[in-house]
């Protein structure tokens, strides 16, 4: 027995190495899987590929900037494009589905903020398991709704392509032609971007917590 900084250390001759995993490289699969998450270049670590600035001042990461841009700029523009498309064509199904998916995204953030505030006041975890699964199903449902709406409006016989083809027959100098084609292109892009963004939000909410559950091997709610 030796001492270092007043802490007793076990004699190395008394340590049974077989009790600690045997030969090198023979760790159980679940331990190797868990330890892989602590690598500096792990794909699942959000800061693994971040470039830290030389100064010590706190800065926003690129993920935060993209989130703020999507939350405050991109999604409102998508709603404006859907509204203009409805006003020009009178087709209500696809714009309504896109608007519902975007509004549902904002509602989930409001619910999460409210639950976070209430549960912190009560000294509880932010999200319970039923709330987590409910929000996961809700976000997944809004993503599917946005995808089906974008696909139906784009490829239906009287949908977006038909509207574009009809307005392309107008004279090139007609201002209605330019306006209609511009709104149609903006609406088509906004519908597919909204669908992709809805799937990204659903996957980001679910997979991060599912991954943590797999790593810790215990149910988590946050």
UniProtKB/Swiss-Prot annotation:
Keywords: Host Golgi apparatus, Host membrane, Host nucleus, Membrane, Transmembrane, Transmembrane helix, Virion. Signal peptide: none annotated. The chain crosses the membrane at residues 64-84, 98-118, 131-151, 180-200. GO terms for biological process: viral life cycle. It is a multi-pass membrane protein. Its main location: virion. The keyword Transmembrane applies. GO terms for cellular component: host cell Golgi membrane; host cell nuclear membrane; membrane; virion component. The keyword Chloroplast does not apply. It comes from the Viruses. It is found in: Virion; Host Golgi apparatus membrane; Host nucleus membrane. Belongs to the alphaherpesvirinae UL20 family. Interacts with gK (via N-terminus); this interaction plays a role in the coordinate transport of UL20 and gK to the trans-Golgi network (TGN), and is required for their cell surface expression. Interacts with gB. Plays an essential role in egress of virus particles from the nucleus, cytoplasmic envelopment and virus-induced cell fusion. Forms a functional protein complex with gK and this interaction is absolutely essential for their coordinate intracellular transport, gK glycosylation, expression on host cell surface, and function. Together, they modulate gB-mediated virus-induced cell fusion and virion egress and therefore actively participate in these processes. This is Protein UL20.
């Amino acid at each position: 027995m030796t001492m270092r900084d007043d802490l007793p250390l076990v004699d190395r001759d008394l340590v049974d190495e077989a009790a600690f995993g045997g030969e090198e490289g023979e760790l159980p699969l679940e331990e190797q899987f868990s330890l892989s998450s602590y690598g500096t270049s792990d794909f699942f670590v959000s800061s693994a590929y971040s470039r830290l600035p030389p100064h010590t001042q706190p800065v926003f990461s690129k993920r935060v900037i993209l989130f703020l841009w999507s939350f405050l700029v991109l999604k409102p523009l998508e709603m404006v494009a859907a509204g203009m498309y409805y006003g020009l064509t009178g087709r209500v199904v696809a714009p309504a589905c896109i608007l519902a998916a975007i509004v549902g995204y904002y509602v989930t953030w409001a619910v999460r903020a409210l639950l976070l505030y209430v549960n912190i006041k009560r000294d509880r975890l932010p999200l319970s398991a039923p709330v987590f699964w409910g929000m996961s199903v809700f976000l997944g449902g809004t993503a599917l709704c946005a995808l089906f709406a974008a696909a139906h409006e784009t490829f239906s016989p009287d949908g977006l392509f038909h509207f574009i083809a009809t307005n392309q027959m107008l004279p090139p100098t007609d201002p209605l032609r330019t306006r209609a084609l511009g709104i149609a292109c903006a609406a088509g892009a906004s519908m597919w971007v909204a669908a992709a963004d809805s799937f990204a939000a659903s996957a980001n909410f679910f997979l991060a917590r599912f991954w943590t559950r797999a790593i810790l091997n215990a149910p988590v709610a946050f």
